[in-house]
Amino acid sequence: MQEKISKFEDFLTQLQQNITTALEQHETNAAKFISDKWQKPDTPDQKLKGYGNSMIIEGGEIFEKGVVAFSRVHGSELPPSATAKRQELAGKSFIATGLSLVIHPRNPFVPTSHANFRIFIAGADTDTPIWWFGGGFDLTPYYPFEEDAIHWHQTAKNICDKHDKTYYSKFKKWCDEYFYLKHRDECRGVGGLFFDDLNDKSFDECFNFVTDCANSYLDAYIPIVAQRKNIEYSQKHKDFQLYRRGRYVEFNLVFDRGTIFGLQSGGRTESILSSMPPMASWRYNWQPEQNSEEAKVYQYIKPRDWIK
């Protein structure tokens, strides 16, 4: 099992380089991803041990902020967020390896994107370890274009169909349900794919699906960035982007499993919260004008079949 974990780690660290390099090619000022490598000390007082590399870009003309973060951590006991629905895992040691990214563009016409790919092994130090993969990618537009959402979902479906014809509809529905703000009765964006507890096939089959899915993120996102990054925008557009970013913050702090897991397990706070946007705003009881550009997004962030 250790060999398989290391193989996935090697894939993720190379993917991190591929993604940051591809994104930098679209940046028009001197902003670059900087590497912040870290290691948790192996001491008795540390609940979580391990290491990682958070790559951050800030202040770009295209990407106002972005993080592509790799981590490999282990602990003696899974936190409550990981065992709430799987009581048989309570008290087990674990290893978790993953890559998580969030890209916050400066231009309100370029959507925010998020992706995450991970493996968990519970009881890795036993004769019967339990493994599963999780991950996916989702898109959060502020001023949506239907063709962008169709391209995003078509890319997702193409990858899913290559491995299992049932995956896209199942993981698309899961994504719509997961990225939902209950207190707002809103979805976070137009969705994509979300899956967890993936071990329904052999390890190699699951590994191949997850790595193909991860490799398709750039195919899904880069064409959208290229198409929208030079659209002119006003302060009104920017203000609405900041307002909608507030929903992103609310979801990450209240509902996101990765954030909750990281904080409950004693993870590295700076890396866990690095996905937050550089700026966001809240307006009391604000509503967009009827039939305005700003009202349009509320029709797009409802679950729908993007692929006819």
Swiss-Prot record:
Involved in the heme biosynthesis. Catalyzes the aerobic oxidative decarboxylation of propionate groups of rings A and B of coproporphyrinogen-III to yield the vinyl groups in protoporphyrinogen-IX. It comes from Francisella tularensis subsp. novicida (strain U112). Its cofactor is a divalent metal cation. Its main location: cytoplasm. This is Oxygen-dependent coproporphyrinogen-III oxidase. It catalyses: coproporphyrinogen III + O2 + 2 H(+) = protoporphyrinogen IX + 2 CO2 + 2 H2O. The active site is at H114. Homodimer.
